[in-house]
UniProtKB/Swiss-Prot annotation:
The gene is YEL1. Residues 548-696 form the PH domain. This is Guanine-nucleotide exchange factor YEL1. It comes from Zygosaccharomyces rouxii (strain ATCC 2623 / CBS 732 / NBRC 1130 / NCYC 568 / NRRL Y-229). GO terms for biological process: regulation of ARF protein signal transduction. It is a peripheral membrane protein. It holds the Pfam family PH_GEF_YEL1.
Amino acid sequence: MNNLSSQNIGTSLDFQESPGEFEEEEEREEDDSSEISSLPPLTQVATASPRMIVSPKMQNIHLIIQNEDNDSSEVNTPHEDWHANLGLGIQSQPLRNERNVEEHYRTRAKRQTILWAENQAEEDTMTQERVRAEAELQVKFEGARAKAEARAEAEASSRAGLSTGVNGANRTVEDTKSTGEQDEMTRKTAERERRLRAEKERLLIEEDARKKAVQVKLEKEKEEEEEGKAAAGRTTAAPETPEDQEAQRIAVEIVQGIYKKISHTEYANFLGTKENHRILKRFIILLEPLPNSLVLSLYKLVTRIYFIAEAQAIDRILEELSIRWTTTNPATHWGSHYNLCHIVLFSLLILNSDLHNAENNQPKFSKEEFTENTLFAVEKESSKSNFDLAQHEPGIREELGVYYEALKYMSLPLLKKDENKTNVRDSRDSKDTRIRIRRRNSKMSTRSQLNNSTENSSSDDDTSVISSSSPSARREPHYTSNWKFHHNKPLPRLYRKEPLDEVFVFSNGTSWCVDSGIKMNERDLASSSNNKSTAQRTTRSRIPSSAGGIFRWITRSKSKSLLHGNKSPVAFFDGNTKWINVRCRVCEGRIYVFKHYPPSMGPQNSMQDLDGMKKASDVYFVCSLYESLATLVQDNVVVNNNHEPSRRGDLDQRGNFTVIIPASLHRKKTLLEFQTSNVEEAQRFVQCVNFWAARLTPVPTAQFEIVSNEENGWSPRVLSGDLPIETLETLYLSDWRPLLSISHLYSEQENSTEETNMVDKIEVLESFAEYLQRTIDSHNTVKPLMISRWRRTRNFERAMDNWNKKYLYLNELNERTSVYLNALQLAQRSVKH
């Protein structure tokens, strides 16, 4: 302040005021300074409050202010005197010298310093209070935390003590228990764990079955959505593809009975073919809504179409009906197990035939027998699909009883024919002399077919809608080939072509072909041939179809044995047997026999045209080898009167073999007897015949009998020993015979020969041979039980005779299977070598 220049002071804004203002301001400043000087010292103010804490900084400021006050008091003494004496001197410009300015600023700085010190003291006081409050809060927090930790430690210590006490008490109690009580507790614990495991396994099985059922249902729904759903009386979305549209159109026309391409009597066969499955699905959908009763659903089905067809077609229709029924009726005790509903539907068909077939002379099914037999079949199938039969058995029994009563008084209209639905083709069908010959198939082992002879065949057989719709070869009745060959009709291919067939099919002397001049029993040729003099009388009127309707294929075989007829190969041992020279060719699944002159012996040209051979023969016949069986009789045969000495002077060693042609519906089995120049040639014929028979003949199913109410002597109720002797004495025993002939046992489809190759056929035959062996062993096990149950009754001989018949039948079938298997294996080995 002392260094300020006079020039700067004179030009300062503070000194540009009007005259008189400076004096007034100075008076005010003096008044303020007097007031300030009258205040107590800063140290007194700072220490007056007991809560004030004066920092060292504040003490230094106080000392500075105090020193300035002392200096001010010394300097202001002359000024005060000057002010008192010269009250108007403030208006005089000369009095405003540098000293006055310096005093003014010193006073002003002192006042500001005092104000700043006071503010700083207040701030320090507030800060101190806040710090003290925070300190007190921290102390309280630390105390609370310490108390909480102490309480937690106390609780932990208490729990540890309590646990120790409980454990000690438990140990004390356990020590006081006896060994027997401990064993009892262990046993109960183990039993409880076992029950829990069993319950867990049961739940897992149920869950798995539920998931599978849901998956099957979802797959069905997805498939139905893709193909489109059509219901009677309501509009549905059009199928996506032209094939779907065509299938929908045909299904609607079949339901309405106006489909013109086939007779209405062939609708069931048409729907049941594999290639028409898409049409079948839409046909079943058009039957909706399906009743919640299986018998009523079946009744609705058979009133829509003429339900006389092949077993295979019926089986497929019933299967699709079962699938659709379980889908639309999911709340029944059958759930999603359509395969069980399929069994029930087939049982209902069999029951209907049993109750209402006038030609059935067997005892009728009772309600109990029908129920027990159907439940037996359901039980076998339910074990494969996780169906709890025990849980639903009461309801199923009641349901089957209702079905029995319904069919007892309301037969299924299987033979119903609506004259209003006939079409142009019906008139020709009414005069047709054919009986359709097709292969049968059923999952309930109701496999069947209708066989017929030459007289009951027609070339139209192979131009039907069903056969023409399939590109595969169909089964041909044994003597249909003869009729076609005689009337110059083309012979269809009977087998599936394989690469080896192209090489060996006409290779003479192999498993594929044998063509040679041999001898044949003249009686066999006369009974088998279809010569020119009788050819015009081969067509007869059609045999009525009243012999059983759809269940004609359930009728029993009339032969005494399944594989052997009344005729035996005695010609080889009969010196009076007349042998004639014939040319025999075995090729492409058929056997051709020609009698012509001049006779030729030994191997022939297997490539020679058959028409030329036929023209050169006065007697001939052709037969398919389906189900046939060739047998080498013996290596050395007793020589007859026509023997010739050999060059060595010994008797010729001729070969002899037979060929059995199975029986058809109206024809007995045929036994053909042949004689060759040597055993090796006979062996080649036997191998070739059995090779083609094995390729053409489907493998029998694994189950041979349908649901039957007959008692043959080994039913479970008899073997259980629960029946008293009196009941066994009065029990009616039926004579055991195969329910179905061997041709009725096959599960192959109509085009099966197109689907099974040699390698697969060998594997299937091997599996079936093993099954037959197990079946024979199982049948042997019941013999001791039968003896113990029947030996004291008058039915003993009859029961054991039934057992023996079935045993012989199984052994014959086993022998036949082994022959077919060996023939295929031999052909396979010959190709490899």
